[in-house]
UniProtKB/Swiss-Prot annotation:
This protein's name: DNA polymerase IV
Active-site residue list: E104
UniProt GO BP: DNA-templated DNA replication; error-prone translesion synthesis; SOS response
Required cofactor names: Mg(2+)
Record SUPFAM superfamilies: DNA/RNA polymerases, Lesion bypass DNA polymerase (Y-family), little finger domain
Similarity section: Belongs to the DNA polymerase type-Y family.
UniProt enzyme class: transferase
Higher taxonomy: Bacteria, Pseudomonadati, Pseudomonadota, Gammaproteobacteria, Alteromonadales
Site label Substrate discrimination, positions: F13
GN (gene name): dinB
Record keywords: Cytoplasm, DNA damage, DNA repair, DNA replication, DNA-binding, DNA-directed DNA polymerase, Magnesium, Metal-binding, Mutator protein, Nucleotidyltransferase, Transferase
Biological function: Poorly processive, error-prone DNA polymerase involved in untargeted mutagenesis. Copies undamaged DNA at stalled replication forks, which arise in vivo from mismatched or misaligned primer ends. These misaligned primers can be extended by PolIV. Exhibits no 3'-5' exonuclease (proofreading) activity. May be involved in translesional synthesis, in conjunction with the beta clamp from PolIII.
Length: 359
């Protein structure tokens, strides 16, 4: 039985700003780009969230919801330093750390003997140490599998934690909304709802085969998650699956020619990123992404063994066919990377009985 902890810092970027600039405390603040430059909110504090401000929201719209919102440009170098401090705390308890971003990570503490092996007590200790070292609060979810640990970390925010023991899983997943499962977005959830599938209990009444016929490989994953099954282990060295570049435009654009003028810089920057971070990796697809003035987006991709500038422009033309009169506010290009693993299989470790407190 694994013991997985998902640690998620509470409104991380905004919390760092409030820590370093106490005059911001108690006021609605957001870290993000300027509204006059079509910036986007990266994160915001809880005071701002009361007004409906959310991550990935246009700064201009956020200011309409909350006229007193204080926009902070952000200090990525500081956030990275604090993230490194947090990582050092994790490393005192386990080497099995899978960072998801600067402010969240999975930890496998199955073999940790501290605090009598209790995952609950270990999570409490980690959160306490993070606060002592950084002055910031963190929330945590504890469960035997990754996806439930991630869901649990959101159930007692901010500055809290939630435990899902093995015995709790059957009842917990029964009422769990499918949209809460990581990987199930709004579009997929809407498709599932048209089939009468809203909760995990609804999926449990289906066969794996019927779901796979409808959704392919994801159908099988969904079936497993609805039973509370997630065989994925912790990946301390997560393999990068793609490299991309995108830009939010100063003004909406509408034509292929206008997009054409933006593409060379994007492709050049993408080429540089591939050279720096994925030079030894083979690519397997190219992707063009457009976000429209209604904030809906579309992506077009095609298999490719090497980067082709012409293919990017061909994909751009296809993506523009979906514009339907809307303005384009964001344009992006990316490549998918082949896995570095060769002949990778499923390795299962069988652990002997441990005299510990479990969860």
């Amino acid at each position: 039985m694994k013991k997985i902890i998902h640690v998620d810092m509470d409104c991380f970027f905004a919390a760092v700003e409030m820590r370093d600039f106490p005059e911001l405390r108690g006021k609605p603040i957001a870290v993000g780009g300027r509204s006059d430059r079509r910036g986007v909110i990266s994160t915001c504090n809880y005071e701002a969230r009361k007004f409906g401000v959310r991550s990935a929201m246009a700064s201009a719209y956020a200011l309409k919801l909350c006229p007193d919102l204080i926009l902070v440009p952000g200090r990525m170098s500081v956030y990275k330093e604090v993230s490194a401090q947090i990582r050092e705390v994790f490393a005192r308890y386990t080497e099995l750390i899978e960072p998801l971003s600067l402010d969240e990570a999975y930890l496998d503490v199955s073999d940790c003997t501290q605090h009598q092996g209790s995952a609950t007590l270990i999570a409490e200790a980690i959160r306490r140490e993070i606060f002592e070292v950084t002055g910031l609060t963190a929330s945590a979810g504890i469960a035997p599998v990754k996806f439930l640990a991630k869901i649990a970390s959101d159930l007692n925010k901010p500055n809290g934690q939630y435990v899902i023991t093995p015995q709790m899983i059957p009842e917990f997943v029964k009422t769990l909304a499918l949209i809460k499962i990581p990987g199930v977005g709004k579009v997929t959830a809407a498709k599932l709802e048209t089939m009468g599938l809203i909760t995990c209990a609804d999926v449990q009444a289906c066969s794996r085969q019927s779901l796979m016929e409808r959704f392919g490989k994801f159908g099988g994953v969904l079936y497993d998650r609805a039973q509370g099954i997630d065989p994925r282990g912790i990946s301390p060295h997560r393999e990068r699956k793609s490299v991309g570049v995108e830009t939010t435009l100063a003004k909406d654009i509408y034509t292929y020619e206008q997009c054409q003028a933006v593409m060379p810089q994007l492709i050049q920057e993408l080429s540089g990123r591939i050279s720096r971070s994925a030079k030894s990796r083979r690519i397997h697809k190219q992707v063009v992404k457009l976000k429209f003035d209604d904030f809906k987006q579309t992506t077009i991709e095609q298999r490719s063994d090497e980067v082709s500038v012409k293919l990017f422009y061909d994909l751009l033309k296809q993506a523009l066919e979906r514009r339907a009169g809307r303005g384009i506010r964001l344009l992006g290009v990316s490549v998918g990377l082949e896995s570095e693993a060769v002949g990778a299989g499923l390795d299962e470790e069988v652990h002997g009985a441990q005299m510990d407190l479990g969860f």
